């Protein structure tokens, strides 16, 4: 419930978010089951929308209208391929390999991260990604997020636009677009105080494909 409530807190400050009405933990628990252990607010919405991204060289970016956001590292992980064989491990995901690769390429660790923009088709996806990136140990994601750590004013601002759960569901473009907004310092009311390092993630299949 903490992830759903946190996302909604961020979404109330995002003029582009679809769900901007505050959500309490009591309302979360009172919502109907979709498939246990997932309540209604554990699951993302379905909506129409569009996001555009311009990718170019650092030299060319200096001449463009918007301040550039530099990609320091990237990685991907594919522990399973449902087209070839079933992937039944719902605990370890491609985020572990993708995160290690991206952070190593950038020369940073999780201790250096200012803000996270994570793929969150379900609240569980946020939790397991934080675990696999190394922000906490495996199995400790629930307690890690329970104290408002991801919410406004928390130690690790996460999905600051409301994520896919409360803002808009545009697949991997949701975290990417908000990461760019935060890194540029254009988040307005929801802008993170520190925003030098903002990883974004994307997830595919039943947790078996991940990009960082």
Model-based region annotation:
Residues 136-148, 188-193:
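A glycine-biased, small/acidic residue-tolerant capping/turn segment at secondary-structure junctions
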Residues 2, 33-97, 101, 147-156, ...:
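Condensing-enzyme catalytic core mediating Claisen C-C bond formation in acyl metabolism
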Residues 1-37:
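Glycine-rich, mobile lid/loop segments that gate access to catalytic sites or pores
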Residues 74-77, 114-123, 164:
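A short beta-alpha structural unit
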Residues 98-112, 187:
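Phosphate/pyrophosphate-binding loops at sites that engage ATP/ADP/AMP, CoA/4′-phosphopantetheine
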Residues 83-88, 120-143, 154, 206-212:
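Short glycine/threonine-rich loop-to-helix capping motif typified by GTGT followed
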Residues 1-14, 53-59, 167-187:
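Active-site-proximal alpha-helical scaffold in enzymes
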Residues 161-169, 182-186, 190-212:
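Structural signal for terminal/edge beta-strands and the immediately following C-terminal loop/tail
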């Amino acid at each position: 419930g903490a992830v759903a409530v946190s996302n909604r807190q961020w979404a109330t400050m995002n003029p582009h978010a679809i769900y901007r009405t505050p959500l309490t933990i009591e309302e979360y628990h009172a919502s109907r089951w979709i498939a246990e252990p997932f309540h209604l607010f554990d699951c993302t919405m379905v909506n129409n929308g569009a996001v555009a991204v311009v990718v170019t060289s650092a030299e060319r970016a200096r001449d463009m209208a918007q301040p550039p956001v530099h990609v320091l590292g990237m990685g991907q992980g594919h522990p399973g391929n449902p087209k070839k064989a079933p992937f039944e491990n719902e605990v370890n995901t491609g985020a572990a390999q993708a995160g290690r690769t991206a952070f190593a390429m950038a020369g940073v660790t999780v201790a250096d991260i200012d803000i996270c923009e994570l793929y969150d088709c379900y609240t569980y996806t946020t939790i397991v990604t934080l675990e696999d990136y190394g922000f906490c140990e495996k199995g400790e994601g629930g307690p890690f997020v329970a104290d408002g750590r991801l919410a406004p004013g928390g130690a690790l601002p996460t999905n600051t636009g409301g994520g896919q759960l409360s803002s808009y569901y545009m697949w991997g473009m949701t975290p990417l677009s908000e990461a760019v907004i935060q890194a540029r310092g254009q988040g307005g009311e929801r802008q993170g105080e520190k925003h030098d390092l903002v990883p974004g993630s994307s997830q595919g299949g039943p947790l078996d494909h991940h990009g960082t």
